[in-house]
Amino acid sequence: MEHQNSQSASYAAAGVDITAGYRAVELMKKHIARTKNEGCLDDVGGFGGCFGLPMASMEEPVLVSGTDGVGTKLRIAQLLDKHDTIGIDCVAMCVNDVICCGARPLFFLDYIACGKNIPEKIAQIVAGVAEGCVQSGSALIGGETAEHPGMMAEDDYDLAGFSVGIVDKKKIIDNSRMAPGDVVIALASTGVHSNGFSLVRKVFDVENNPALMKPNDFLGGKSIAETLLTPTKIYVRSILALLEQVDVKGISHITGGGFYENIPRSIPDGLCAEIDRSAIRILPIFQLIAETGSIPQRDMFNTFNMGVGMSVVVPASQAEKALEILTAQGEDAYVIGTIVQGEEKVILK
């Protein structure tokens, strides 16, 4: 028997299937190939992913990084045994942060930890990651799948990612030019996205609630579980199109902490985003969460995106143009507020 096979057999006895790892890599290669762009310099399988930086048109290129995971939304994917969209969420959580600086995402890396490497499941997860990369213009240049027998149940897995983007230093969006009278525009979300799922799981008792899988008239015939698993919206291409023609002064990715935690991150001291609560197009899933869990409205806005996945601040004189551009990109975009002087960085009225 060859030495390598002996090692593999010993490792398999400890719970790590090297052969399954090889199989998973082969299955995911076709998905990774979809993400290749002009910056890719090598194929998957090396010790490091190489990427050529597009700096010719920039005076002072700056790299912008972001890393995130999907959190306990993974549990919904596991309950539905549907794993081909959760990777979109992982990419979205990272690239939507990177674009808030005005940076164009370049490449992405993923990390999967699992109790047991089931090649077909791993390939489904990576297929979702690849789709997110395609949507954001990112190349998937590397990743890691780690099998953790004895630490995780066989069906369990966790997913995280890392995005790197680039922007010319003079074009970094840093809120320094924001002024009273500027307009706050909302970009609609596709649903809960990837935050607040610990509360969602408690409200709906997801481990013991068969009604989650049944069609729900309030949700347009979709089940609660299906609605919850809807992938996080990726706003990269829409924001890049907006940046080409409009003076964008601030961008907020509405994630964990909702409006109260995320909008202030793009507002400078002395200014306040005054949001018209009645203008927000709250999605039915949030109404259902609030009613089922008897959750106060402020808590909802302090936890969830409530139907607004991203907000941008633009001059009032360019608001109409911004809406036209975003609509042309397929976004449901609308005005939800204005910038005023104030000590509180966000007020919902």
Task: Identify the residue ranges that each predicted region occupies.
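Short loop/turn motifs at secondary-structure junctions
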Residues: 102-104, 199, 247, 332
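N-terminal amphipathic/basic leader segments beginning at the initiator methionine
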Residues: 2-39
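Glycine-/charge-enriched secondary-structure boundary and capping motifs
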Residues: 2-13, 121-136, 152-159, 210-211, ...
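Acidic, glycine-rich loop-and-beta core segments that form the ion-binding/anion-interacting portion
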Residues: 178-222, 226
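Acidic-glycine-rich active-site phosphate/pyrophosphate-binding loop
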Residues: 61-64, 69-71, 174, 213, ...
